Amino acid sequence: MLTRKIKLWDINAHITCRLCSGYLIDATTVTECLHTFCRSCLVKYLEENNTCPTCRIVIHQSHPLQYIGHDRTMQDIVYKLVPGLQEAEMRKQREFYHKLGMEVPGDIKGEACSAKQHLDPRNGETKADDNSNKETAEEKQEEDNDYHRSDEQVSICLECNSSKLRGLKRKWIRCSAQATVLHLKKFIAKKLNLSSFNELDILCNEEILGKDHTLKFVVVTRWRFKKAPLLLHYRPKMDLL
């Protein structure tokens, strides 16, 4: 079978952010045109613009942040193609938390890969040590029963700001920072016996949140200098023109 070697430089244009010219971190894609950027770069750009930075198509006239989504597949590809990028990003996050004197979340305490890996000089492929494979299998079993309790946690207060819906009996919840707004919509819909979670909008500071926003992202971008808990409001979905 014939194989063809491709230099990383040849595909850089497909795995870098047009806004910062660096490799994609927390890859986020515009749903309208499928162009991808670093999440922090795109969110900052959309604070003053409503068009795609690449093709200039209008994402949405008033709420462009609702039409972007985390692209896990693209981020996985970038991490696999660029040696050491994921480990470097994890290290930067740990240093960030240490600098602020905050506890490092459980999901980034260790190295990005739980197994010890080395690069095969013959073909550039990554291989894991046998002992690490055994340790990884045992750790995975423990993680399966963890239910994200070791993740960074976020305290939330869910308030209803519409007379058309009732309030939750227990409006205070605590969950993983990796949970998304979509998870909250499903939770509220189940508690209120709604026919569909798509009937809801969730807001922070009177701004509608995109369904793919993680709670960590919401805290960092909308609640950074405010005290816990994170205050969110829910209401019946309003169609935006």
Curated annotation (Swiss-Prot):
GO terms for molecular function: histone H2AK119 ubiquitin ligase activity; zinc ion binding. It is found in: Nucleus; Nucleus, Nucleoplasm. Residues 117-139 have a biased composition (Basic and acidic residues). CDD domains: RAWUL_PCGF3 (cd17083), RING-HC_PCGF3 (cd16735). A zinc finger (RING-type) spans 17-56. Disruption phenotype: Combined disruption of both Pcgf3 and Pcgf5 causes embryonic lethality; there are no live progeny. Male embryos are detected at 9.5 and 10.5 dpc, but are smaller than normal. Female embryos are already extensively degraded at 9.5 dpc. Placentas from male embryos have some parietal trophoblast giant cells, but fail to form a labyrinth. Placentas from female embryos lack trophoblasts altogether and fail to form a labyrinth. Defects can be attributed to the observed lack of monoubiquitination of histone H2A 'Lys-119' and lack of Xist-mediated silencing of one copy of the X chromosome. Keywords: Metal-binding, Nucleus, Repressor, Transcription, Transcription regulation, Zinc, Zinc-finger. Residues 115-148 are annotated as: Disordered. It comes from the Eukaryota. Component of a Polycomb group (PcG) multiprotein PRC1-like complex, a complex class required to maintain the transcriptionally repressive state of many genes, including Hox genes, throughout development. PcG PRC1 complex acts via chromatin remodeling and modification of histones; it mediates monoubiquitination of histone H2A 'Lys-119', rendering chromatin heritably changed in its expressibility. Within the PRC1-like complex, regulates RNF2 ubiquitin ligase activity. This is Polycomb group RING finger protein 3. It comes from Mus musculus.
